[in-house]
Regions:
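Nuclease and nuclease-like effector domains acting on nucleic acids or nucleotide cofactors
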Residues: 1-110, 146-171
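Histidine-centered nuclease catalytic patch
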Residues: 102-133
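Short, compact, well-ordered microdomains
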Residues: 126-150
């Protein structure tokens, strides 16, 4: 849609009102519960689809993005000693960890679609998604850690331990 079309549709009053709203501090706005619920459903859907794929296919053969090799190589260069078997929140979200993760994530801005979207990650690679075994990370952190788990054979146990399930969306 052309910008002229937007301004014609809104008119001068609409544009001024929009500009005044956008110039207000973010703290003045509450999170819309319906938007949060839709986001949570989308994150859960992504987790279910990924886990069902893990239950069905040899993880070493999985291709998550067109940039898998670059993501994995960069991840292991920057985090050579990070064990991805059993993670804890501190390793991903402490101030020190955030300082190290931020530049890694930003390398994929404009490269990996939705690189900064919130995505659920399993803390223990041998477990399924659950309240106790899931944490919210950026999409690029999810890709980096799951690619490492897949390439390093850590997700191999999933196919024998779990079976694909129907999506909660269809129930």
């Amino acid at each position: 849609m052309a910008m002229a079309s937007v301004s014609n549709d809104l008119g001068a009053e609409g544009l001024v009102a929009g500009a005044s709203v956008l110039s207000r501090p973010a703290e003045e706005f509450d999170n819309d519960p319906s938007v949060e619920a839709m986001w949570a459903m989308k994150a859960l859907e992504h987790a279910e689809v990924y886990f069902n794929i893990l239950c069905s296919v040899d993880p070493k053969l999985l291709k998550l993005t067109p940039h898998d090799e670059n993501i994995y190589k960069t991840f292991r260069e920057e985090f050579p000693d990070l064990s991805v078997e059993k993670l804890n929140e501190e390793k991903l979200k402490s101030p020190e960890a955030k300082q190290k993760w931020r530049p890694f994530c930003e390398k994929f801005k404009g490269v990996v679609e939705d690189y900064s979207f919130g995505t659920l990650l399993r803390l223990d690679n041998e477990g399924e998604y659950s309240n106790e075994n899931s944490i919210l990370v950026t999409r690029i952190q999810f890709y980096a850690i799951e690619l490492a788990r897949n390439k390093e054979g850590l997700n191999d146990c999933i196919r024998s331990k779990y079976k694909p399930t129907k999506s909660s969306k269809n129930q």
